[in-house]
């Protein structure tokens, strides 16, 4: 197999994957918070993590939009 056609992973690709991971973590942490009925401390921790991860996802999405607006698609 020839190595003359390498796949290039861009920063935008990495940001997109990070955003996808982040949104998935938000859903996971929200579900964990709802499902954790036996430990209020853990449920509150999961809810806090969901909010924190939501902020990360929003920042990543903002960066993705800036890439799109500047033609880095």
Regions found by a protein language model. Name each.
Residues 1-73:
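Iron-associated oxidoreductase/ferritin-like identity signal
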């Amino acid at each position: 197999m020839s190595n003359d056609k390498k796949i290039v992973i861009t920063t935008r690709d990495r940001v997109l994957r990070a955003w996808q991971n982040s949104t998935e973590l938000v859903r996971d942490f929200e579900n964990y918070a709802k499902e954790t009925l036996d430990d209020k401390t853990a449920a509150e921790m999961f809810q806090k993590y969901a909010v924190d991860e939501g902020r990360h996802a929003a920042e990543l999405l903002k960066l993705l939009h800036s890439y799109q607006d500047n033609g880095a698609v």
